[in-house]
């Protein structure tokens, strides 16, 4: 039994080590498209207007969390994950930004911290959200 368990551990470790998801010899360059408390400056429309120039130098742009938060913030206290109208702009502006990046050869990476969440009244009182006809609480 011990040999079977040890074999299983080695197989799982090998699979985990090879499943990192990032190309082995990736030579691209990523730009962080925001800085601390930059929601006044880092509008989706501002980044979109810079997409052509960024495309000459960068392969990926890391953008902040885009869900709706309470008040103006950097996005790390989202109240709603499926509502993309945030301090950075509207969902339509976000989609236009991603398209502009794609058209200029830039990938987009969203910075999402899943366990950072704003509540309604206490630590576990989150608002209900509906996505594709299913309501989540």
Locate predicted features.
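Positively charged n-region of N-terminal signal peptides that target proteins for export
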Residues: 1-4
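Substrate-binding/active-site clefts of carbohydrate-active enzymes
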Residues: 21-52, 56-137
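Hydrophobic h-region of N-terminal signal peptides that target proteins for export
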Residues: 10-18
